[in-house]
Each structure stands twice: as C-alpha cells, then as structure tokens.
Regions:
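Phosphate- and other anionic-substrate recognition elements at nucleic-acid/protein interfaces
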Residues: 1-139
Length: 139
C-alpha cells in the first residue's frame, strides 16, 4: 500500500489528458520538477500541481472493521498522510503553484471502463493512475 502514487498530466488548452500512470513518489517528483523546469525555461506550459490531501479528511470508513483490519487501514492512511506532507514541503520549496485537495471533493475509485467513458482515455490504467487523473481532469 502506498508504494506507488497516481500521476497524471492535464493539458488545459487542449482539454485532454496527456499522461495517466502510477509510479514511485520520487519519480513523480522528478517529473513535476522536469515539467516546472521546462516552464521556467520558457519551453513548457504553466504547471499547477494538485495533490490529494487525506489530512483534510475526518473519517476513514473503519466503523465496521475488526480491530486488526482497522489497524492496517489506519496504517495505510498514515502513510498516505505522510506522502501528502512530503509533497506539501517539496512543492513549497520548489516554488511551483500547487493545491492540496480534500479527498471528498475528488471522484475516486472509478473502474477502468467508467474512467474511459468519462475521460476518453483509452490506454491501460490502474486505480492509482485513475485517482491521480481525476484530481486534474477538467481543471
């Protein structure tokens, strides 16, 4: 859980997704830096990063779980919260424009079929990639 992070690039001029994937957090950070470097050099478009921030969520759906299941779920939540903190610090230091987004305001956990129908994205995706794409889709 939490090994890979969803990553997507939305082109607001073309109104289309350019990339949807899942990759380790350090690789996602390298891609953000690369896109931002291109923008600063005058060869790329403006970059706005949106990060899902579970620190803004107040419930985690553990009410009907056993103690063991709840413990595992909350460990995963802790790891995702830590990732959000890391992103927050990294993006602030990088100087790129960004927004931390509360999970409830984002459409997540779409099936591959539903995602294709909604976005028109035809390539293979996983849940992480689709969740990342829904953070930027239509933005």
């Amino acid at each position: 859980f939490g090994v890979n992070t969803g990553f997507a690039v939305w082109d607001s001029k073309q109104r289309s997704l350019l990339q949807v994937c899942s990759l380790p957090i350090h690789k996602a950070m390298e891609r953000v830096r690369s896109l931002y470097d291109e923008y600063k050099a005058g060869i790329g478009d403006k970059v706005i990063v949106r990060v899902e921030d579970p620190r803004q969520r107040t419930w985690f759906g553990t009410e009907r779980m056993s103690r063991e299941m709840e413990r595992k779920k909350l460990q995963g939540v802790g790891s995702v919260k830590r990732d959000a903190s890391i992103w927050d610090d990294y993006l602030k230091e990088l100087g790129v424009e960004y927004e931390m987004v509360a999970p409830k305001r984002n459409v997540t956990k779409l099936t591959q079929e539903r995602f294709k129908a909604l976005t028109g994205w035809q390539k293979q995706t996983n849940e992480h990639g689709r969740d990342g794409a829904m953070l930027v889709y239509g933005f």
